[in-house]
Amino acid sequence: MRIAFAGTPEFARVALRQLLDAGFDVPLVLTQPDRPAGRGLKLQASAVKALAVERGLAVTQPRSLRLDGKYPDDASAAREALEAAQLDAMVVAAYGLILPAWVLKLPARGCLNIHASLLPRWRGAAPIHRAIEAGDTETGITIMQMDEGLDTGDMLLSERESIRSDDSTATLHDRLSALGGRLIVEALEAAACGGLVRRPQPAEGVTYAHKIDKAEAAIDWSRPAEEIERRVRAFDPFPGASFQQAGETVKLWRAAVAPQRGAPGTVLSAAEGVLRVACGDLSLDLLQLQRPGGRRVGARDFLAVRSTLQVGATL
């Protein structure tokens, strides 16, 4: 079976690796253009491109696939490459570009998407973040036959994954990426022998995982402690929950709910390795923090540097 692969970040790289290790023929890889990254803002290839180059695969990086869009030459070149590949199917995983109708119709078996939720819950761009933020206790992977809607296509395979009480987006991402890679291999192997059954998504239970905005990172101490703690885990590693202290933006990577109460944003404890801040109902112990340009440290090390942070201060 000849498969094109469209994906960009680490989540997609894991799936591509599993497809290649399973012996699938991948004549073409689509991924986002190289982007400036790091302190030097040097152009950096995506995780998918790095693997594709390592494995000697052909790569194309269109800025758009819309033939009538801003970059028609990119789209036309991609179309030529896809048509020449004589595809049986196309696998899409966190690609980052909208696929127009001509792409969806081109492969003989259409386009299959690896989506990191149990559809129809958490359609959209940030299903892992939003599941943790909402306090969901389980999520999963859905392999979907793509159509022109936003994650509305028929479901082909799905499998559940528990969300642990200490999961961050980073830890849950790693388990789901491995699960997604395994399920897409199973789906394609079943498709090759006619064993896949398409199931329409239920009309009930639809929710949308809107893209994460950096502005969401700012902690609102007036919110309930449990809600803030979930957001801390949901925004690890991006964009990182944060608060202002002494004119600096401090990122908070781990926290735990504590029973003490006080005015929201007030420091209730700042000694003996305990940094506790009042929230809208209870309070939070800030367990792992990061100053600008620094590394993640525990509360004790953070307080050793922040000697001016005293009980009664307001964040």
From Swiss-Prot:
It comes from Methylibium petroleiphilum (strain ATCC BAA-1232 / LMG 22953 / PM1). Pfam families: Formyl_trans_C, Formyl_trans_N. HAMAP family: Formyl_trans (MF_00182). Belongs to the Fmt family. The keyword Electron transport does not apply. Attaches a formyl group to the free amino group of methionyl-tRNA(fMet). The formyl group appears to play a dual role in the initiator identity of N-formylmethionyl-tRNA by promoting its recognition by IF2 and preventing the misappropriation of this tRNA by the elongation apparatus. The gene is fmt. This is Methionyl-tRNA formyltransferase. GO terms for cellular component: cytosol. (6S)-5,6,7,8-tetrahydrofolate binds at S117, L118, L119, P120. One of its GO terms (molecular function) is methionyl-tRNA formyltransferase activity.
